[in-house]
Design a protein with these regions (language model features):
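Binding-site signature for planar aromatic cofactors or substrates
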Residues: 1-223
Length: 223
């Protein structure tokens, strides 16, 4: 897998023989594929992964986007920012997001990556922390199961218009709330709270989408 990226981007610091969880999302067709394995080789422009699991997931909550390479005029040489506290720009990016990716881990079964989507505003930001309602899905519970075993998690938000990205790492916990309360958008009675500990922000996305069609199964916001 090719991985051209700035010197201080997170992918530059991976070491071999560690477990890896990937997700590949084709937004134009609303398809996704999860790949888990072990990192066997890394260089300045590539990753090699020994695949142990690969399986598709349903198209629920994937927004339809036609991605294309951003023109040079839309790209920025602004520096990558590392920090521990969300800025207002970070909060605004999260609040307008309709998509994010989440990485979780298990003490003995490796790492996993998954997709979360919903209407803009489905991820709430309060007092420097994030939370979002869990939606009905395919009942595999890979992400929630991992969080029960290990609360470490990483989130990636992308602005497909500006190219800005926000990578957060921290701790996530599952909360059972009871159904029907404000913010329980899909009436599952559960939500995930996330406390950021480190962040990497920049204009790292080389792809753009000029328009978006919302997933037909997005539930409305209830708060």
């Amino acid at each position: 897998m090719r991985k051209p990226c700035p010197p201080r981007a997170p992918l530059q610091h991976l070491t071999v023989h560690q477990p890896v969880g990937l997700i590949v999302v084709e937004f134009a067709t609303r398809r996704r594929l999860r790949i888990n394995g072990t990192l066997s080789d890394t260089g300045s422009d590539r990753l090699r992964i020994d695949v142990e699991q690969a399986y598709g997931n349903c198209p629920q909550y994937i927004q339809n986007r036609q991605l294309h390479t951003a023109p040079a005029s839309a790209r920025s040489a602004e520096p990558v920012r590392h920090g521990h506290t969300l800025t207002q720009d970070d909060i605004d990016l999260v609040r307008r997001a309709d998509t994010f990716l989440i990485g979780t881990t298990h003490p003995t079964r490796g790492n996993d990556a998954s997709h979360r989507g919903g209407p803009p505003g489905f991820v709430r930001v309060e007092d420097g922390q994030l939370w979002w309602p869990d939606y009905w899905g395919n009942n595999m519970f890979n992400t929630l199961g991992n969080l029960q075993a290990d609360p470490a998690a990483a989130l990636l938000f992308c602005d497909f218009t500006t190219g800005h990205t926000l990578h957060l790492s921290g701790q996530a916990t599952l909360e059972w709330t009871g159904t029907g309360i404000p913010g329980d958008d899909d009436r599952t009675g559960r939500r995930v709270h996330f406390t950021p500990e480190q962040l990497v922000a920049g204009r790292l996305l080389s792809l753009q989408a000029d328009s978006v069609t919302a997933a037909p199964d997005n539930p409305p916001l209830t708060d």
